[in-house]
Curated annotation (Swiss-Prot):
The keyword Ribonucleoprotein applies. PROSITE patterns: RIBOSOMAL_S8. This is Small ribosomal subunit protein uS8. One of its GO terms (molecular function) is structural constituent of ribosome. Keywords: Ribonucleoprotein, Ribosomal protein, RNA-binding, rRNA-binding. GO terms for cellular component: ribonucleoprotein complex; ribosome. The gene is rpsH. The lineage of its organism: Bacteria, Pseudomonadati, Pseudomonadota, Gammaproteobacteria, Lysobacterales. It comes from Xylella fastidiosa (strain Temecula1 / ATCC 700964). It holds the Pfam family Ribosomal_S8.
Length: 132
């Protein structure tokens, strides 16, 4: 069965696993999903993200979730731009999450990065998701 929004599927898997206290979560590999997971790792929302080779020659991404005092570090994980309604922002309109306490993950011409790095680089792009 094909998936209409693989990024939304990845975000929901992470959110659901964190809400029930799982130590890690796996989902099918794609370069975009790996880039998003690495941004989450660099921002300190997860411990690790690595590519795992499955036995049927398809790769998976395994994300090791992070908890603080028994509660998940990721409180908000929301898909913004979706297949039915894309959301693009120029460098001046890039959204801040919770007044700068969270991050927006942006797909730019220079790669997938946070809103603050996109402002530093002077580029806009598609707003993929909000994380806090």
């Amino acid at each position: 069965m094909s998936m209409t929004d693989p990024i939304a599927d990845m975000l929901v898997r992470i959110k659901n696993a964190a809400s029930v206290g799982k130590p890690n979560v796996r989902f099918p590999f794609s370069k975009v999903k790996l880039a998003i997971a690495l941004v989450l790792k660099n921002e300190g929302y997860i411990f690790d993200a690595k590519v795992i080779q499955s036995d049927n020659s398809k790769s998976d991404i395994e994300v090791v979730l992070k908890y603080f005092e028994g509660r998940p570090v990721i409180r908000i994980l929301k898909r913004v731009s979706r297949s039915g309604l894309r959301k693009y922002c120029g460098k001046a309109e890039l959204p801040e999450v919770l007044g700068g306490l969270g991050v927006s993950i942006i797909s730019t011409s220079k790669g997938i990065m946070t809103d603050s790095k996109a402002r530093e680089s002077g580029v806009g792009g598609e707003v993929l998701c909000f994380v806090a």
